[in-house]
Regions:
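Beta-strand elements within well-structured catalytic alpha/beta cores of enzymes
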Residues: 1, 16-21, 55-57, 78, ...
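Metal-dependent active-site segment of extracytoplasmic phospho-/sulfohydrolases and closely related
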Residues: 1-31
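Intrinsically disordered, low-complexity Ser/Thr- and acidic-rich flexible linkers and loops
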Residues: 2-9, 115, 175-179
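Loop/turn elements at helix/coil->beta-strand transitions in domains of secreted/extracellular proteins
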Residues: 11-17, 53-54, 122-123, 143-146
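C-terminal cap/loop subdomain of S1 sulfatases and analogous C-terminal strand-loop tails that border
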Residues: 25-37, 41-47, 64, 71, ...
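Tryptophan-centered short beta-strand motifs
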Residues: 26, 266-283
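The feature captures the short pre-catalytic strand/loop hairpin that immediately precedes
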Residues: 56-64
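Long, internal low-complexity/basic segments
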Residues: 78, 173-183, 188-257, 261-265, ...
Length: 346
């Protein structure tokens, strides 16, 4: 096709094509096989390679055709790369998490040292964080050819052998990567404990920097979870204007986090719930100020052992959670049920 903006040339001479996906294919659909990510393990909603590794095909002017690369890149790199390839300056007010892949694409696509941060340092690390939901309660970090998985669901879970898993996906020789264990078949956490500890510390530092959220434990889980008997008890609340005060009792575990969960449309067909920090005042007191228009609210307390106590007890009725919450309009908590028995996460 002729390029109308560039007489005498084809569109293909002035066009970059990027083909990729947002995640690995979904596996485990009941009754049928939709996708199979073999030889990679697992699929969508997993931090294993079958869930996080996706196809990536790029073509365009200056990019050598028919070349395969094992260099680690991700979707955050597309924006700075497109700006670079099209000659557009990065907006001064923008902080870009991705890297410009133009030096890699227009040079040696097998040379991982060409992928650099804006400060010029080579990027060799990536982090994935899937803290909630089903089989994806995990975080991972990849540094060079090694990948560490932190499983948050390892406590009292017979399906999980260890809190951490370590895999050697690639080995590097003379600056070039070669495939070693992208199937994640050989867990090296016991044979390389130092490597695992080092990467676990790097992962924790990265998650702390981004203020990541973590899964909470349910003290009413039937499993024998350690320290669940030490979860706090919420005693009372007092509402005045758009401020609310709660009183709670610690039972052996220190409360470390408090959040107010509120909605502006409680009781409607599609409720929306929001979270804001509440203030731990010491001596068993929590205070919070909620937005004008709030109809219902809950208090979430998390202790040092990562157990969650919700007040009042969260009971869903259909798709509504307002029925069991504190009602701002009437300031009531139903006396017919325990006000602080169960947590609302596992």
């Amino acid at each position: 096709t002729e390029d109308p903006r560039w007489p005498g040339h084809k569109l293909s001479e002035n066009t970059y094509v990027i083909f990729t996906s947002d995640n690995g294919g979904m596996e485990g659909h009941p009754g049928e096989i939709i996708t199979d990510n073999y030889p990679l393990d697992r699929g969508k909603i997993s931090a294993r390679e079958g869930g996080t590794r996706v196809p990536l095909l790029i073509s365009g002017p200056g990019i050598k055709a028919g070349v395969q690369s094992d260099v680690m890149v991700n979707g955050l790199d597309f924006y700075p790369t497109i700006l670079s390839l099209t000659g557009i300056d990065v907006p001064a007010e923008k902080h870009l998490d991705g890297c410009d892949l133009a030096p890699l694409l227009l040079g040696d696509v097998t040379d991982a040292s060409l992928v650099k941060h804006s400060d010029g340092s080579v990027r060799d690390t990536m982090v994935w964080h899937f803290p909630h939901g089903g089989d994806a309660m995990e975080s991972t970090i990849r540094i060079g050819g090694y990948k560490l998985i932190h499983r948050y669901d390892h406590i009292a879970n017979p399906k999980v052998n260890s809190e951490y898993e370590l895999f050697h996906l690639y080995e590097t020789t003379d600056g070039k990567q070669s495939r070693k264990d992208i199937e994640e078949a050989h867990n090296l956490v016991d044979s390389l404990p130092g490597k695992a500890q080092e990467m676990a510390a790097e992962l924790k530092a990265a998650l702390t920097e981004m203020k990541a959220s973590y899964p909470s434990l349910n003290p009413d889980c039937l499993a024998a979870l350690p320290h669940k008997e030490n979860v706090c008890t919420v005693l009372t609340h007092h509402l005045q204007g758009n401020e609310i005060e709660f009183r709670y009792q610690e039972n052996g575990a220190r409360v470390t986090q408090a959040d107010l969960i509120y909605t502006l449309n409680g009781g409607e067909k599609y409720e929306e719930w929001f979270r804001i920090p509440a203030s731990l005042k010491g001596d068993g007191k929590v205070t919070a100020e909620f937005p004008e228009g709030t109809t219902h609210l809950y208090l979430n307390l998390v202790d040092e052992n990562q157990f969650l106590r919700s007040y009042p007890e969260v009971i869903a009725k259909g798709k509504s959670f307002a029925g069991s919450a504190v009602s701002v309009q009437s300031d009531t908590v139903s006396p017919s049920r325990p006000v602080a028995k169960k947590a609302n996460a596992t």
